[in-house]
């Protein structure tokens, strides 16, 4: 059975403070072979750096989430750039636009999204894009920055299959997690049916977005088999075919040889 690559997790989150070491020590024995722990704020990026040093199978992504961009300065941007170049840092992220909340203002978010896209281009690493209620501006800024030359993943994909075509044409991957198992996720299921299997990677976004039957509880990489089962059903292929494709795609996404 092909191992699982969780392409997007937040084990640095406070939700794991009580049992983090115990949980992370157990994952490899449960078929979770690789995890990318993803930064969201400057503080969480520091924790990501610690985790990727501490565990062989954990890699990092360093970047500032749109909701945290108000804290960015030229000085902290320079620090980000330095950390992103570490060997075990596989991507710049998570970066993007989030218009669900009123703050930070859209111009601040756009400014730092573009700057972090430029950073990824400069250091030749892919990006992990967070986009919520901001499809048009995300596409426009990615087009402006020639994101097709940078590459990366649209994490926790939540838009239509029509929007998926635009990201596919840019050569991006799609991160799919627990939401796929939700009864009300009709739009996502249609998008996953449409997106070719060679463009899909698995993720948790843990501790958030646990799949059914654990919806509402703390998520972890151990829940990915529920997502695999849902995807196999939608795609009309076996669970092993989903595992194998997702593993191979994850290696390509993050420029890993094996």
Which ranges hold each PLM region?
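Mid-domain alpha/beta scaffold segments of enzyme catalytic cores
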Residues: 1-258
């Amino acid at each position: 059975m092909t191992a699982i690559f969780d392409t997007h997790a937040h084990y640095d989150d406070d939700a794991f403070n009580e049992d983090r070491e115990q949980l992370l020590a157990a994952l490899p024995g449960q078929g979770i072979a690789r995890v990318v722990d993803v930064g969201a704020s400057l503080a969480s990026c520091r924790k990501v750096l610690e985790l990727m040093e501490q565990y062989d199978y954990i890699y990092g992504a360093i970047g500032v989430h749109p909701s945290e961009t108000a804290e960015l300065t030229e000085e902290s941007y320079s620090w980000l750039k330095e950390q992103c170049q570490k060997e075990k840092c596989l991507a710049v992220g998570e970066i993007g636009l989030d218009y669900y909340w009123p703050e930070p203002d859209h111009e601040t978010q756009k400014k730092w999204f573009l700057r972090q896209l430029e950073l990824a281009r400069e250091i030749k690493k892919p990006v992990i894009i967070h986009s919520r209620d901001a499809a048009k501006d995300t596409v426009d800024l990615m087009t402006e920055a020639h994101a097709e030359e940078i590459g990366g993943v649209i994490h926790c994909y939540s838009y239509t299959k029509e929007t998926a075509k635009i990201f596919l044409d840019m050569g991006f991957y799609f991160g799919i997690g627990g939401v796929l198992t939700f009864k009300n996720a009709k739009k996502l299921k249609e998008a996953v049916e449409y997106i070719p299997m060679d463009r899909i990677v698995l993720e948790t976004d843990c501790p958030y977005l646990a799949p059914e039957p654990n919806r509402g509880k703390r998520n972890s990489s151990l829940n990915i088999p529920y997502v695999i089962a849902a995807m196999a059903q939608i795609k009309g292929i076996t669970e092993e075919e989903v595992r194998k494709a997702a593993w191979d795609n994850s290696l390509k996404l993050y420029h890993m040889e094996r």
